[in-house]
Amino acid sequence: MTSVLGVYQYYGMSRISSSDLKPKSELLPWDRPFAGRYSGWATTVSHYSGVLAVAPLALAGYSWYKGDADGHDFGAFTLMFVEAVALQNALNQLVRSSQLWSRPFVYSERGEGRRKAESARGEAYGSFYSGHASAAFTVAVFTGEWFSEIYPNSQYKSLVWASSLTLAAAVGALRVVAGKHYPTDVVVGSLMGTGVSLGILKLHEICKKNIAFWAFPGNIGAIFYF
């Protein structure tokens, strides 16, 4: 339901006239220098970063193939990952639909940035917070947590965590360079993605310990442990 509402709100966003555009002086002090920025190549590269989303599932599939995890583990992990991605996306769209401030490129006064601003859709006027950064850190944290759970004694744990978080941070940086988001958008997006991942993982951990389900012909039920 949250996802549906988020999508509805997101695509219902309307353009803001230049006279109603928030003045640069009202942006956060550390964000103002980025108003008017636009980069086509950074926009393209940041969009392709979506391929990183397969990393957690690829890792889970590899673990299953190698026998380090079973089909139940793979299914549970996939379910949690889908839940986390859907939740972070819905939350992002709900917040962005408030149109707290516009994307940096909307303030462009010349060149390609100006042309993009003139043809921008309503979503361009809701920059806060970065969905790309949120998604990237959701993926990064899930990858690190899954690897740590399946291979708790691996010498590569630190490398996996460092690589995942570095790639996620790079996605956020590209969104700033592209003129799609301000530093504040990226920082908050990173925290939201991390929080959603850890929250979903913790919730399933609690449910796994405190709830037992059974099902057989003519009967289905659950036991809650307190």
Predicted feature residues:
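N-terminal transmembrane-helix/juxtamembrane module of multi-pass inner/ER membrane proteins
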Residues: 1-59, 96-115
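Alpha-helical transmembrane segments of multipass membrane proteins
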Residues: 5, 9, 87-92, 96, ...
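Juxtamembrane loop-transmembrane helix junctions in multi-pass integral membrane proteins
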Residues: 34-44, 70-73, 123, 152-155
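Hydrophobic, membrane-inserting alpha-helical segments
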Residues: 35-52, 79-85, 117, 198-201, ...
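Alpha-helical transmembrane spans of integral membrane proteins, capturing the lipid-embedded, hydrophobic core
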Residues: 57, 81-89, 165, 190, ...
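Membrane-water interface at transmembrane helix exits
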Residues: 59-66, 92-100, 144, 148, ...
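Interfacial segments of alpha-helical transmembrane regions
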Residues: 66-91, 161
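Membrane-embedded catalytic cores of phosphoryl/pyrophosphoryl-handling enzymes
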Residues: 110-225
